[in-house]
Amino acid sequence: MKTGLTLEQLAAEITRQQSAKEDYVVNTGNLRLESYGPDLTLRVLDSDGADRIEPLEIGDIAHRQIGTHLSIPAKYYERMRSEDAGLLAHNVNTWLERTPAQRMIRVLDGKVRAYLSNRYLRMDNYSIASAVLPILAEIPDVRIESCQITDSRMYIKAVNPRLQEDVTPGDTVQAGVVISNSEVGLGSVNIQPLIYRLVCSNGMVVNDAATKRNHIGRATDAEENFQLYSEKTLAADDHAFLLKVQDTVRAAAEEARFAQVVGMMREAAAIPMNTADVPGVVKLASRQFGLTDSEGEGILQHLIEGHDLSLYGLSNAVTRYSQDVSSYDRASDLEIIGYNILAMPRSVWSRLNQVSACLLYTSDA
């Protein structure tokens, strides 16, 4: 599992961001994208054309969301952004004027970090962390193995060492839980079981057993609310969800579900790979599960080093490789992909091995 912040560092950053962030609901007709050489800023204007707030820098996520909202193809948007910022500003401003709407812009440290629907429900990291951390502290011997806050998400990954089993003799796994949240529209609040493998500190996220809450609420009108402040009172259903979050975290990976996943791991350990063409199987599996060629090469290396040419070995190679990537977000994706590989239908696994064998036979011929 990729190392992130300490819990103290995470708490400090969440608290800092809670004070530093600002949210606004605006009419898109009052937005202007302006270029200064290669740099772009977003202005929020009043009816007289004066700035309501200081011009804002724009983050990568917000750029993608602006392009999506205005139906500008992503590749073309990025080409204009890198090669002709003035052309991008002209395109964006034209479509903002022609397609008026109300949008929420989320700002942190003077930069637009998200460009969202005015129905976006702000269930922020501070609220989630405040709900779950006291519950984690109640679990005897609980360990916070890793946590992080990125531009995209907050993650808290905890392990309950009192709930553990051996997949094979000496290969011990422990139950845990992953809490994640996105404040920028890239995902719901998620609470997912985690399987932590002691032998190599791998984490595998069980992707089909999540408690989640989407960030969809009532529409906020720009004429009534320009700047949105921290909500001291949440809607009743949001309070109910936070209670559900606490209950899920308190269970810290329910014992029956943990036993079920361990059973899947034991079964996968007995399912062999086509050893005549291990690189071919890895390449096909990489394509099947959205892995890049370079990721596949790293996974192949860990698979060979692990001396376990089975379905279980492949899933572990993926989660082990997650520790090598620089992006914490991508590392967390790989922890989910590792489980998806473990849980793939046996018909898909058989097909991957058969196709690999056929390709090897064809190349030899």
Language model features by range: what are they?
Residues 1-82, 164-363:
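Intrinsically disordered, low-complexity regions enriched in serine/threonine
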Residues 72-99:
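Short, amphipathic alpha-helical segments
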Residues 88, 154-158, 267, 271-275:
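Charge-rich, low-complexity amphipathic helices
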Residues 91-231:
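Internal, hydrophobic cores of structured domains that mediate oligomerization or house catalytic pockets
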